[in-house]
Each structure stands twice: as structure tokens, then as C-alpha cells.
Amino acid sequence: MFIESFRVESPHVRYGAAEIESDYQYDTTELVHESHDGASRWIVRPKSVRYNFRTTTTVPKLGVMLVGWGGNNGSTLTAGVIANREGISWATKDKVQQANYYGSLTQASTIRVGSYNGEEIYAPFKSLLPMVNPDDLVFGGWDISNMNLADAMTRAKVLDIDLQKQLRPYMESMVPLPGIYDPDFIAANQGSRANNVIKGTKKEQMEQIIKDIREFKEKSKVDKVVVLWTANTERYSNVCVGLNDTMENLLASVDKNEAEISPSTLYAIACVMEGIPFINGSPQNTFVPGLIDLAIKNNCLIGGDDFKSGQTKMKSVLVDFLVGAGIKPTSIVSYNHLGNNDGMNLSAPQTFRSKEISKSNVVDDMVSSNAILYELGEHPDHVVVIKYVPYVGDSKRAMDEYTSEIFMGGKSTIVLHNTCEDSLLAAPIILDLVLLAELSTRIQLKAEGEEKFHSFHPVATILSYLTKAPLVPPGTPVVNALAKQRAMLENIMRACVGLAPENNMILEYK
């Protein structure tokens, strides 16, 4: 059964005029390694900690500024939100299609809230806590191309022609602000697009981004802004002592116009200085140590890296299943070809390397979780290949072969072919990242014994379900298994309204 909304009634939850407060018992374990009678042993002790959560329920008018607004992802997301807001329908060869938010965790998925008369009851994910309605988002952003969003949508060749014709009047007036362009960080083939760039030193470019954010916020009358990078994949930046290893060194390097400070890092610095959440949707190391240091000191949300949309999402499910079933993956070979501008940019070796790292590390935590299958340091052979084939456009092909060892020396091979409509998968993920980033800035918590409420750690692990290479605070384990990531996100939101984690025990029927 499906219900549209619900309200929690509990002595541990209080609904106020502008906030929800919950008193929550967090049950976990602590491990101790000790010696006993001359032998060492592990002791696992159940542990309970009480937390108070406070969530502001006033939903702001939210502005979204996309770096790479005129790209396939930016134009597709903008078009999709307008189509939903205006209730647009259009003819395809199969049927009359209605605008929707399919592919969005927040808008098109559900959560289990209990059972009634022997039937499972589900509610929209977005009903857990008050969220921004995506129809109300205000878009802006930057691009190194000055093409308006209507023409960018046409260039992308993602949406049906009938839909494009209806959207054009809404998008023709949307023109990206000039962006930061550094040909050293992206493929040389992107130079032909670069007719809309910010001139000057790196410090002057960063200051212009700050000015742009302030002017956008003032002109659009939004309460909050979230900035997200959906521009070209950059090459990795060199991390060097004295250059970008600390907050002080990073800012000094910007002042000195050091060449190794990337455009994405400049955008991120500008956002952190303004207290604006910044999310990196590409695989490069935007968040160098000095930037993470800066974000922590300024208590400003940062999240990333790289949208998890197609092949990697499948991989994080399948390998988790195999290892969890006691099956040993020994070889993972992933091949992609695509023909959009992302593929064109990734045809350069230095930018492909960023993507290769992002896609290759996704199974690490699953492998390390099972020392029965893998010895220390052992890892499956893992190869990632990406090729540029212009004809296929945004319709990315992904082919994977998984070879595993099974019972008594047997071998198992799984082969997948996945046609990933690249931007149509990425756009709702961008939407979720923006909405969840904003929501997380309205949540505060304090543990038992703490005097004051505080926000989540600025490095937003809550967004990890949506990213290939989740950014985590120093010393925090990286979790890539998709089911664990979704459970973490859902259970934190459940805690905010005093609901227990969904443990699937269903003891009432046992």
C-alpha cells in the first residue's frame, strides 16, 4: 500500500512551528582487542548513544548555479525541471509522454514506514522531511561557451524534438555567465567552445565567481544557493607541500597565480569563502587537502566526487552481491564508448586518467570486507576502458565482464551490456545532490553530553549514494556498496523524525 504522507507520534519527537526535534537512540558496537590467559581475543560490546536531532522545516527558495550549465547535463536538467513545472507533454513514436522525475531518489523512490493489516506500507522518500520542490528551483551558472540554453539543448541531442520545440521559449533567454578556462586542465579539443571566459589572474577569476554568486542571489531573490560542477573532467592536480596541502598554502598559491591550481578548485574556494555548498560532479581531485582544510575551518558543505549514474552503480551492486554471497570476483573488465562532449574530452589521456581512478576504486571496500576470500593486499584485476565514438552521442554503451572463483575451483563469468542514456541518468542525480545538500544544511545534531547543536561534518558523506568516489572526512572509512549508502541516507533522515532504522527483521511476523 502507498501513502502520500505521514506524521510520527512519539514522546521522542516534537513538531514545532519551524523545526522538528527528535531524541534518538543510536545503537552500535565498540571493539576491544585484549589479551586473556596468554591469548589475544576480540571483544564486541553493544553500545548505545543518545542523539538529539533538530531540523529546520522552513523550506527556502533555492538557487542552483551549475558550472558547465550549457553542457548536456546542465541543459537537460534545466529543461526537465521546466517541463515538470509547466506540465508539458510531448509526442514520441510510442506514446504521448508526460514530464516526470524518474531516476531521482528524492522524487521517485519510496521508503517503508511499517505494515498495516499484513500489508507493507510505503511512502515517498521526500515525505520524510520537508524538502525544496524541484519545480521551484531557480537556475543559473557558468560555461566557457556563450550558447544559450535552448541552443545548448539542441546541440546536446538528448531530448525529443517535440519537447525541445515546446521548451525553447523558456530557455532562449538563459545564457551562461563567463567561466574559468584553463586549457592545461582539459582536453585541447575543448578550445573551440571557449568563447565565454573570465580573464585575469587566478585570484581575479576567483573573485569574479564570488561576485557572480552574490549578484545571482540578489537578482533572483533566492534564500540559498548551491553550486555544482558538471563541467568537463579535469586532469588530476599535483598535490605538493607548500602549494595546496594546507588552507594557508592554497590561498597563498592563488595569490601567487600558481599554475597548478585548477579551475574547479577556484570555484570551490569561492563557494567556501561565501559559505555556499559546492558539489563536484566530475572525477578530478578538486578537493585538494588545502581546500578540505578550508571547508572544515569555514564549516561549509562540500561533496563529491563524480556522478554515479550507470556502469559504476551496477558494479557497486553486483560486486557487493558476489562478495556478500561468498563468491570471489577475480577479474573485472569495464568497457565504455560514448559520443557526447564528455566522451570527446575524455579522449585525452590526462583527463581519462581522472575517470579511470574514480571508476576503478569503487570495489575496494567490498573486497577488503572479506578476508576469507582475499588475502591482505589481494585485489581483483580491474581494467577500465573509455572510447569516443561520435555517432552514438549521449547514448553511452557500457560492457562489463566479471570473472569469479566459485565452489571447488569452478569459475563463473557474468557479462553485462548496459545502454546508459548519459545525461538522462545524470540529471536526476544532480537534482538529488542539490536537494539533499540543501536539506543537510538545515539539520543539526548533538550527542549525549554535548552542550550545543552542530551541523554535520562539512565533508558531506550523506551524499555518497550519488557519487562514484565518495568524499569522506579524514580518518573515515569509504563505503561504496550501494545498498549501504542508501541505507545510511535513509536511516539518518528517519532518525530526524524519531524512526528506527529499517532493519528488515520483521519480528512481528516471526
From Swiss-Prot:
It is found in: Cytoplasm, Cytosol; Nucleus. Its main location: cytoplasm. GO terms for cellular component: cytoplasm; cytosol; nucleus. The keyword Cytoplasm applies. Pathway: Polyol metabolism; myo-inositol biosynthesis; myo-inositol from D-glucose 6-phosphate: step 1/2. One of its GO terms (molecular function) is inositol-3-phosphate synthase activity. It catalyses: D-glucose 6-phosphate = 1D-myo-inositol 3-phosphate. Keywords: Cytoplasm, Inositol biosynthesis, Isomerase, Lipid biosynthesis, Lipid metabolism, NAD, Nucleus, Phospholipid biosynthesis, Phospholipid metabolism. Induction: Induced by sucrose and glucose. Induced by abscisic acid (ABA). It is an enzyme of class 5 (isomerase). NAD(+) binds at residues 70-73, 143, 180, 190, 193, 230-233, 281-282, 306, 309, 340-342, 355, 393-394, 422-423. Its EC number is 5.5.1.4. Highly expressed in embryos, but transcripts are undetectable in roots, leaves, flowers and anthers. It holds the Pfam family NAD_binding_5. Its cofactor is NAD(+). One of its GO terms (biological process) is inositol biosynthetic process. Plants silencing RINO1 show a low phytic acid phenotype in seeds, and high accumulation of inorganic phosphate (Pi) in seeds. Key enzyme in myo-inositol biosynthesis pathway that catalyzes the conversion of glucose 6-phosphate to 1-myo-inositol 1-phosphate in a NAD-dependent manner. Is a key enzyme in the phytic acid biosynthesis pathway in seeds. PANTHER family: MYO-INOSITOL-1 PHOSPHATE SYNTHASE. Belongs to the myo-inositol 1-phosphate synthase family. This is Inositol-3-phosphate synthase 1. It comes from Oryza sativa subsp. japonica (Rice). The gene is RINO1.
